Structures are given as structure tokens and as C-alpha cells.
Amino acid sequence: MQTWSSPSVPKLRGAPRPLRLHDTATGEVRPTAPGDTARLYVCGITPYDATHLGHAATYLAFDLVQRVWLDNGHDVHYVQNVTDVDDPLLERAARDQDDWVVLAMRETALFREDMEALRVLAPREYVGAVESIPGIVDMIEKLLASGAAYRLDDDEYPDVYFPHDATPNFGYESNYDRETMLRLFAERGGDPDRPGKRDPLDALLWRMARPGEPSWETSIGTGRPGWHIECSHIALANLDTPFDLQGGGSDLVFPHHEYSAAHAEALTGQHPFARHYAHAGMIGLDGEKMSKSRGNLVFVSKLRSTGVDPGVIRLALFAGHYREDRPWTDELFAEAGTRLALWRSAADLESGPSVDDVVARVREHLGNDLDTPKALAALDAWAREAWDRGGPDTEAPGVFRTAVDALLGIAL
């Protein structure tokens, strides 16, 4: 699948700071410690609607991860999937009397446009679930052969399931108790009440064909893959395990990331799936999480169509810490526009106060669990001083501009 074009990332003078990031599995902020090549997997969209600000917040958070790693001299091998066949996509296509393939292609194309406009660094591999079906089937065959998968005793729909206890470490990523798992499993695409399962928490690997649904003829039967096995396969096919970081929104902690890891670990026998699990908070509107199901969405494409500078969107979302659930408000949006104007005015000055200490502080803040509020405050202070009092350093405005571009992805 075609990815989008990445902006260039300028080289910044001075000493970088290594990235320490909150790990969901341990509950600690700890070093990411990649090797020469940092390996990142972030779960992509289910393309049945346009990119909203909740999506943008997640992908911008992991864009910062890439930028800090690049600043530290790492190559970054970034993989992202597209869930281009799944129940929400099929349901939306049926509701709107649309062809599900056309809908998926249209929304995936719009997502790429939005990411490019937001100056998000593109993944090296951008992989759809549909194109991955042969590899997914091979993975399920191996899980069946090893006893880490089973078929339902159902003459009509003998679906294939993954026993949640197939690995000894199930639950290590989310650290949830069974009651919480059951609740979230039911809320987030699971089927705890499916008759014939060995346990309510067992997860679907292969759904046998139903009337009116897309399906593929394979060695394990005609059907389509479950959600979690798609990411397991795509990550295993493109990244050595354990890779450095598995990322996504906080609504993916369970069940998606827990099962993706369990599927892969059951196949390979290698634990953990990823060395680090990081999750971005939700963006709210009118007191509710912004989501397609609720319909309380602010779309990136709609903002762009009204002439909103993508830098304003980035700054508005960076005003809060990436792990926090936070609201989108008109005040936040206005403050971001004011901030961008201040920074651009300061970057256009012929000289200013020394900027190296400020850049060092920005690096320190971003290296400490992507603390963007403190990073933005440090840059604000320099820009105000430069505008109000000036300074003798003729290189400072240019270095300021470079730092904002390299570390925050904002073109001044």
C-alpha cells in the first residue's frame, strides 16, 4: 500500500537527549534504548470515515518519538497498518449503500493527505490487512498446528479462535484484572457471549464467510481475519521481535495490543512482543471522547479546507501532554494560532538572544516522556524575549526555526 511523502528533517546543532517514555506494561517512564535502527509499530486506522483530531493526536505523538530518535542519530524503521476489512467499515458501507472497497480506498487516501499536510513522518511500510491475508492464514495454520488456536464445533460457522491463556504472560501489557478485561472486550469488538468458545476472553482469529460479507478462499476455509491477528502478522513480517515500541491510542491497550502481542508470542515463543508499549490519551469534545461511533468529531480535512495552518493543529494538540485525555476547545485553537504567529515573528528577526540553552531545554523536555507543554513554554519564553528585547546573536532566529522544525515538525 502506498504511503505518503515525508518532510525533510533538518539537522540540529548541539547535544541530543535520549528518549525516556512511559511504558504501559510496567507503569514506568523508562529509556527506550533502541540500537542503531529504532523499530516502531503504530496501529493505523479503520478507513470508514475521515481523520479526526483524536487520530491526529495519536499519530503526532509518535511523530515526536520518531523526531527525538532521529535527533539522537537513530535510523527509524516505522511500520503502520490499515485495517481495510473489519466490521465497522462493512457496517458503514452498508449504512451508506457504498462499496466497502471504494469507501476504504477513499478514506485511506484522505488519511494520507491529512498526514502529509500535518507533516507527520511517513512509515517505511504502510500495510493493509487485505494484502496481508496470505501471511495471516499461514500464521493461523501454525497456531492451529501448535494447539494455540482451535475451531468452534459449529457446523454452520466453524470460526477459529485463540485461547487467551495460550501464553503464560497474557495480561502483562494491560495489567487488567479479568473483570475489566471482560468489560473492555465486550465494548471494543470482542464477542464474549459467542456460543461454543472455551472461554469468553478467547479472541477471533478467522471468521468464516457469512452472507453478504467479503471473504477469501484459503486453506483454513473461506472467510476473513480477525482484528488482532492482522497487526500481529504485519509486525512480525516487517520487524524483528522484540521491536522497540508498540504504539497507539489508549483505547487499544486492551484488547487489541494485549492480543496482538499474545498471538505473536504464541507463534514465536519469544517474549515480549515489544520492549515498550506507549499509548496516547483521548481527545474530547463537549465532555465526551471524540469518536466515530459518537459522531462528535472535528475532522482534520475540514479544518484544512477552511485554511487552518497545520502548524496550529500540531500546536493545539501539543499544548497538553500526549498521555492525558484532554478536550478540544475554541480557546485551545485560538491560543495555538497566537503561539504560531509569535514564533514566526521571532524566527523572522535578524537577531535575538542566545538560543542554545533553550534548545537544550526543549530536548530535555521532549526526552522526558514527550513533555510538550514544558517544551512549548521554553520556546514561548525565547520568542517573547526576542520580540520584546532583541538580542545580539544573528544565528539565533535560524536555530530557533530549525529546532521547531526538527523537534516539533512545525515549519516557521
Curated annotation (Swiss-Prot):
Reaction equation(s) it catalyzes: 1D-myo-inositol 2-amino-2-deoxy-alpha-D-glucopyranoside + L-cysteine + ATP = 1D-myo-inositol 2-(L-cysteinylamino)-2-deoxy-alpha-D-glucopyranoside + AMP + diphosphate + H(+)
Similarity comment: family membership: Belongs to the class-I aminoacyl-tRNA synthetase family. MshC subfamily.
EC assignment: 6.3.1.13
Organism the protein comes from: Actinosynnema mirum (strain ATCC 29888 / DSM 43827 / JCM 3225 / NBRC 14064 / NCIMB 13271 / NRRL B-12336 / IMRU 3971 / 101)
GO biological process: cysteinyl-tRNA aminoacylation; mycothiol biosynthetic process
Class of the enzyme per the UniProt entry, highest EC level: ligase
A GO MF label: ATP binding
A Pfam family matched in the record: tRNA-synt_1e
Motif window: 'ERGGDP' region: 187-192
Quaternary structure note: Monomer.
Keywords: ATP-binding, Ligase, Metal-binding, Nucleotide-binding, Zinc
Protein name stated in the entry: L-cysteine:1D-myo-inositol 2-amino-2-deoxy-alpha-D-glucopyranoside ligase
Binding residues for Zn(2+): C43, C231, H256
Cofactor remark: Binds 1 zinc ion per subunit.
Gene name for this UniProt entry: mshC
InterPro entries membership: Cys-tRNA/MSH_ligase, Mycothiol_ligase_MshC, Rossmann-like_a/b/a_fold, tRNA-synt_1_cat_dom
Organism lineage string: Bacteria, Bacillati, Actinomycetota, Actinomycetes, Pseudonocardiales
CC terms in the record's Gene Ontology section: cytosol
Domain of life: Bacteria
Motif 'HIGH' region, residue range(s) on this chain: 45-55
